[in-house]
Design a protein with these regions (language model features):
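Intrinsically disordered, low-complexity, hydrophilic segments
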Residues: 1-101
């Protein structure tokens, strides 16, 4: 999918995460609401498309560095949102948790 086109798919994924984020291990404490994780899901979604064909383990350190300048970033740290970024990445790349999409 071309860069200008893949962002259109974010609406569908955002709805999925809005509905399902609270079932994920990093969100199960209930300390943060969806708005805390939403930028991380979007970042994972966009990054999976931007780095299509790359392996998460090969790109994670770059994603961590780039998170600090991501345009939709909140004040969250990489460690706080890494799980959400990875979930969104996995959903896009087909390495989804059971029961998704």
């Amino acid at each position: 999918m071309a860069e200008k086109d893949y962002r259109l798919g974010w609406t569908e994924d955002e709805e999925y995460w809005r509905t399902n984020y609270s079932s994920r291990p990093y969100a199960s404490t209930g300390k943060q609401d969806y708005t805390f994780y939403q930028p991380a899901y979007r970042y994972g979604f966009e990054s999976a498309h931007r780095y299509e064909g790359r392996n998460w383990n090969d790109i994670e350190s770059q994603l961590s560095r780039d998170w600090t300048t991501y345009e939709h970033r909140t004040k969250s740290t990489w460690e706080e949102i890494k799980g959400a970024v990875r979930d969104a990445w996995d959903r896009v790349t087909g390495k989804r948790p059971v029961g998704t999409r």
